[in-house]
């Protein structure tokens, strides 16, 4: 009896929560096509280096760039990386690192070139450094990829919130 009652109660609560949320003015960030289309119309210009390439790739995925639409905005950015030794062995060799990636970005109007929005996204990740050279390089590159993904996600959320505010 209890096993069949729990799913029914959960389904009822879920069904009742929709009207309650909409009556308080809640709308999902991506509930409007304005945000999705606005993000898809942003052209990302890659920064220099491997980190710049990784951030651009992640931003292209996150913004879902529509190549069939002329861009309304261009996103330009710079990437700064700092690496700190966090775990040190007895022989004074680092075996754990912290990677701090800062992405300073500017959103420009595609027609006028005027800056319409700017911001900064910071991502901090850690990774182990193995004794084997290949494993150490692979770990560092994985850390870069994770930091680029996190920074791109923060930029995407900032842009989506800005677009949603403009649509309201």
Where are these regions (language model features)?
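Surface-exposed short loop/turn segments
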Residues: 66-72, 76-120, 125-142, 146, ...
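Bacterial Sec signal peptide processing site at the extreme N-terminus
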Residues: 17-42
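Sec-dependent bacterial lipoprotein signal peptides
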Residues: 1-24
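Short, solvent-exposed mixed-charge patches
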Residues: 166-168
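Post-signal-peptide N-terminal segment of Sec-exported extracytoplasmic proteins
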Residues: 45-75
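Acidic/histidine-rich, surface-exposed loop or edge segments in extracytoplasmic proteins
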Residues: 36-47, 132-135
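Sec-exported extracytoplasmic/periplasmic mature domains
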Residues: 60, 64, 152, 156-164
């Amino acid at each position: 009896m209890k096993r069949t009652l729990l799913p029914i109660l959960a389904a009822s609560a879920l069904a009742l929560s929709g009207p309650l949320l909409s009556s308080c003015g809640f709308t999902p960030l991506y509930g409007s096509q304005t945000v999705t289309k606005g993000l898809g119309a942003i052209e990302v210009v890659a920064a220099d280096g491997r980190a710049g390439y990784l951030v651009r790739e992640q931003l292209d995925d996150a913004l879902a760039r529509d190549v069939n639409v002329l861009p309304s905005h261009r996103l330009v950015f710079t990437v700064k990386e700092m690496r700190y030794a966090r775990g040190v062995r007895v022989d004074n060799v680092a075996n754990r690192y912290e990677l701090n990636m800062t992405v300073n970005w500017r959103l420009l109007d595609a027609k006028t070139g005027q800056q319409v929005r700017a911001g900064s996204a910071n991502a901090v990740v850690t990774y182990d450094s193995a004794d084997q050279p290949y494993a150490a390089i692979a770990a560092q590159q994985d850390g870069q990829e994770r930091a680029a993904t996190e920074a791109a996600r923060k930029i995407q959320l900032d842009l989506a919130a800005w677009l949603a505010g403009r649509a309201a």
